[in-house]
UniProtKB/Swiss-Prot annotation:
Its main location: nucleus. GO terms for cellular component: nucleus. The gene is HMX3. It is found in: Nucleus. It comes from Gallus gallus. Residues 1-57, 107-184 are annotated as: Disordered. CDD domains: homeodomain. It holds the Pfam family Homeodomain. The keyword Nucleus applies. This is Homeobox protein HMX3.
Length: 308
């Protein structure tokens, strides 16, 4: 008889669940099955060749990074455009293996030639529109090249002629400096001048009432009469100064003339003896019947010399 106290054998306990590790390495490598190590690619590798999408960050060296996919419609560029988009001044080029190599001159020339606007790319302006516009312009203005050349030559000749005329004008006319406008000079008639001169001889200065009466009688303005008298007084003063200078010169010339007395006279004793004896007495050596004048500024007087 089986023992009632014995219990049937229990099932073995289930195995404990695997412990989840929260290390950064395990989080980065989230996929439990380890894939075969891939060959390292460049940091920025165009993923369009493999996946048909935009750029993706891939593994570099031994470190692995999560791949951030960029949708293709937002950033879809071909490999050719990416190669051309490299900065021209950057002296290194990225190789597929991720190594930096210096660019050669041939590579720089090719990049510059590709980036020049003369290179035929898909982004160039459409030629059919320009051709159509040129055709319409030719239809509107149908001129041959010869006519265009003739028109240009005519315009150049006109410019040359105009330049020559301007040069002649500059030569003929002296440099005009900005000067104040000259006042017009009043022209007096003979009768007016005669009346003014007669009034000036009588009176050098006129009062305001006399000036007003004279101006009314001569049909002139008071300002004209006043200016005429001022000019006439200046002229009169210049004449007086000239006359005074001439008088001074004549007076100075008269002062230079000096009177020289007679040097020899007849002897009084000889005259008396000659009168008593009746014979002619001795004549003086020099006799001057009239006084002689000498012009000498320094000689003032000469003493009278008598014979011994």
């Amino acid at each position: 008889m089986p023992e009632t106290g014995q219990e049937p054998p229990s099932a073995p306990p289930p195995p404990p669940p695997p412990k989840e590790s929260f290390y950064i390495k395990n989080l980065l490598n989230g996929d439990p099955p380890k894939a075969a190590p891939k060959q390292p690619r460049a940091l920025f590798a165009p993923s369009g060749k493999a996946d048909g999408s935009g750029f993706a960050l891939s593994q570099v060296g031994d470190l692995s990074f999560p791949r951030f996919e960029i949708p293709a419609p937002r950033f879809a560029l071909s490999a050719h455009c990416l190669e051309r988009a490299q900065t021209w001044w950057y002296p290194y080029a990225l190789t597929p293996a991720g190594a930096h190599l210096p660019r050669t001159e041939a590579a720089e020339k090719s990049l510059l030639r590709d980036s020049s606007p003369a290179s035929g790319t898909d982004r160039d302006s459409p030629e059919p529109l320009l051709q159509g516009g040129d055709a319409e312009q030719k239809e509107r203005d149908p001129k041959s090249p010869a006519e265009i050349v003739l028109e240009e030559s005519d315009s150049e000749e006109g410019k040359k002629e105009g330049g020559a005329e301007d040069w002649k004008k500059r030569e003929e006319s002296p440099e005009k400096k900005p000067c104040r406008k000259k006042k017009t000079r009043t022209v007096f008639s003979r009768s007016q001048v005669f009346q003014l001169e007669s009034t000036f001889d009588m009176k050098r200065y006129l009062s305001s009432s006399e000036r007003a009466g004279l101006a009314a009688s001569l049909h002139l303005t008071e300002t004209q009469v006043k200016i005429w008298f001022q000019n006439r007084r200046n002229k009169w003063k210049r004449q007086l100064a000239a006359e005074l200078e001439a008088a001074n010169l004549s007076h100075a010339a008269a002062q230079r003339i000096v009177r020289v007395p007679i040097l020899y006279h007849e002897n009084s004793g000889a005259e008396s003896s000659a009168a008593g004896g009746g014979g002619p007495g001795p004549q003086p050596l020099l006799t001057f019947p009239h006084p002689v004048y000498y012009s000498h500024p320094s000689v003032t007087s000469v003493p009278l010399l008598r014979p011994v």
